[in-house]
UniProtKB/Swiss-Prot annotation:
Inducing or repressing factors: Expressed in the late phase of the viral replicative cycle.
Source species of the chain: African swine fever virus (isolate Tick/Malawi/Lil 20-1/1983)
Family: Belongs to the asfivirus H233R family.
The name this protein goes by in its record: Uncharacterized protein H233R
Keywords per UniProt: Late protein
């Protein structure tokens, strides 16, 4: 299956409709049976049904997710599922825009005890006072926090985040490159509002592709993991 996120506006529907048709045609020419699913928010579901029915395309909604949160990120991650090994290590993704729910932290802690390697906290574009709290929670569980920032925020985040927290700071580009060439498979976990998560195993260059897509969407800044930090030396 190829999972494709819905466009930001309905004005792109005609283009999206044509693109999906081309994908299916190419697949059929090569004797491949590929199902294309459009990921939409519940508010957009009715608008997509007429288009998807004509192309035999499924519409999928993710409860609690708006259309912006399920853009290209989900499309790329889901596609990777078919090419990655099962039983990879765990990498938690946690939003720093809001404080994680009470039920989420125990789930993260439990995964860490079972061998999870990292916690990723994507920083919001604007600094807020919840971020230090989130990072401290990670440091408590992980003992070490690796902070990745883009070049524009490097100096600022080094002073605010790294000071007194034992964090390592490097640029986002350097982080993506080094993780991309790594051999250790990683399983991405996306926790929802109830603290549960779906595992998405990635390894090698796919980790870099994921981080690249995720960084463009949510501005990754912070990643904490001892085993990853060791690979960066």
């Amino acid at each position: 299956m190829i999972l494709i996120a819905s466009p930001f506006s309905l004005a792109h529907l005609e283009y999206l409709n044509t693109w999906h048709a081309n994908i299916k045609n190419i697949a059929q020419q090569h004797g491949l049976d590929i199902k294309v699913a459009i990921v939409v928010s519940k508010t957009h579901l009715n608008n997509f049904l007429p288009f998807s029915t004509a192309l035999n395309i499924e519409c999928i909604t993710f409860p609690g997710c708006g259309i912006k949160e399920i853009d290209l990120l989900w499309a790329r991650i889901k596609l990777f599922q078919h090419y990655c090994a099962i039983g990879a290590r765990l990498l938690w993704l946690v939003s720093a825009d809001i404080r994680p729910s009470v039920s989420t932290w125990p789930a993260i802690a439990d995964s860490l005890k079972k061998g999870a390697d990292a916690v990723v906290v994507p920083y919001p574009s604007q600094w807020n006072n919840l971020i230090p709290t989130v990072i401290k929670e990670i440091v408590v569980h992980q003992k070490k926090c690796l902070v990745a920032v883009d070049a524009h925020h490097l100096d600022t985040d080094t002073q605010i985040v790294g000071a007194g927290m034992g964090c390592i700071v490097l640029t986002l580009k350097a982080l993506m490159v080094r993780l991309s060439i790594g051999k250790q498979p990683i399983k991405i976990l996306w926790p929802d509002l109830h603290g549960t998560a779906e595992g998405i195993p990635l390894e090698g260059v796919e980790v870099g592709w994921f981080l690249n897509a995720y960084a463009h969407k949510l501005n990754i800044r912070c990643l904490g993991a001892e085993h990853i930090a060791q690979h960066l030396n």
